[in-house]
């Protein structure tokens, strides 16, 4: 699921400059939106984690895999929609638009993360196995995270139009979603995993 890291880094490292320099809202307004977004991030993690944990295992579909697949769409649509914010909108409309879609995006990102974490805990029951999987995932995240961090350096420092920037960021986000979609094929759920359910509650 390293593609999710690419999208996260783009949102965290590029969106402020995009909205302040390209769209034209003030850094203070963007900071206010990000503050509300951060508060929502802290609130929604246990709520979505609890909800995901209570989902039943569906024969032929799984418990967390359907949530992971759904989360990919929930992440992608709002982030790409935000790139098409118009510089001609007034600040109030822009802030409301930004806040709504950032909240939706964060919900999808949380659903993806807690579902994969819970799947990992329930599938790899020993601490050693979970540690190995976590370490491998951390290494795999490095390249997409590096790419996401370099994109603003490459493209915000040049003479690129708004539409060119939209094209670049849309392509990078779609790449991240594609990598995440490929990654979900590695998830193999067995109903017997959940007979020995361990500590997913509250993730």
Which residues fall in each region the model found?
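Membrane-embedded alpha-helical bundles of multi-pass transporters/translocases
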Residues: 1-203
């Amino acid at each position: 699921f390293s593609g999710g890291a690419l999208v996260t880094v783009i949102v965290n490292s590029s969106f402020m400059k995009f909205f302040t320099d390209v769209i034209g809202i003030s850094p203070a307004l963007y900071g206010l939106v990000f503050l509300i977004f951060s508060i929502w991030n802290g609130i929604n993690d246990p709520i979505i984690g609890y909800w995901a944990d209570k989902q039943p295992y569906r024969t032929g579909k799984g418990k967390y895999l359907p949530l992971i697949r759904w989360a990919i769409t929930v992440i992608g649509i709002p982030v790409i929609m935000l790139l098409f914010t118009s510089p001609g909108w007034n600040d109030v409309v822009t802030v409301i638009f930004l806040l709504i879609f950032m909240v939706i995006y964060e919900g999808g990102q949380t659903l993806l993360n807690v579902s994969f974490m819970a799947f990992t805990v329930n599938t790899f029951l020993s601490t050693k196995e979970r540690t190995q999987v976590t370490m491998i995932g951390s290494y795999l995240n490095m390249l997409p995270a590096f790419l996401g961090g370099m994109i603003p350096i490459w493209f915000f420092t040049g003479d690129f139009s708004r539409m060119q920037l939209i094209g670049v960021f849309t392509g990078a986000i779609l790449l991240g979603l594609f990598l995440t979609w490929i990654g979900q094929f590695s998830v193999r759920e067995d109903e017997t995993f959940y007979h020995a359910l361990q500590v997913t509650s509250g993730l």
